[in-house]
Amino acid sequence: MIPIITIFSVVRDIELYNTCIRGNVFCCGANLQFVDNNAENKAISTRYNDFLNSFDFGKPSWMVFCHEDFEFREPLAPLLESLPRDALYGPIGCTRKGLFPFRHQVFLGQIEEMNRDGSGKPWTVGRRVVPLTKAETFDCCCLIVHSSLIEKYNLRFDEELAFDLYVEDFCAMAKVKHGIKSRVLPFKATHHSGSKPNDRLYRHLPYLRNKYPHNCFCASCTYLGTPPLAMRFERWLAKLMGH
């Protein structure tokens, strides 16, 4: 049976959205929904929650939350047809490898990146992995989840994270609260972003440390929660003080 797929995006650059998604042959057959964010420029996390709050869960669907500049370069339907519905999926995520103190971030999954204005040549980000490899979080560019999982646990995005780290946090919260795993779903795609982390992103880190005082999750450009070294020091101090 061909799976029902709903692709939702928050859009400010209509022309780019038309190129990457609405006019993309690989998105044919999917239910394309978007919100024009030019007038109000609401938080992406808020827009995603608005979509979820208005969704008819009586009509189950795979949900794809992706940026307006995320270009699918192969059809999703064959990949989702027999995919378990009890996990979160994305084309590129992150985890940690190695032993302390040499533990480091590793990308899982591989996509192309390209400058938003089309200049230059695309470059490859990440590394190839076998399908369903476990990740800690996914990049915000694309998250895939079945509506039945959203409905079962009433999953929502944290609106304190307006434009950054909202997908990474979604993965972290799903894991901490409900034990939901994040698994890499490799497919060909190009992210027409070419952007680098900004100061706004890093301003969220104190909030996330308070939110996850006893957990740490690897993201593509930072850590969510309590950094590994700090976690080790706090545990050592507590043990020393007999707590």
Task: Give the residues covered by each predicted segment.
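Short, well-formed alpha-helical segments that are part of the catalytic scaffolds
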Residues: 4-7, 11-28
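A short beta-strand-loop structural module common to alpha/beta enzyme folds
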Residues: 30-42
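Glycine-rich, basic loop-to-helix element that forms the pyrophosphate-binding segment
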Residues: 41-55
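Short beta-strand-to-loop acidic/aromatic patch adjacent to the donor-nucleotide binding site
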Residues: 59-71
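Acidic donor-binding/catalytic loop of UDP-sugar-dependent glycosyltransferases
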Residues: 68-82
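Conserved catalytic core of nucleotide-sugar-dependent glycosyltransferases
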Residues: 81-153
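A short, conserved alpha-helix in the catalytic core of glycosyltransferases
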Residues: 137-153, 159-187
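Active-site donor/metal-binding and catalytic loop motifs
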Residues: 182-208
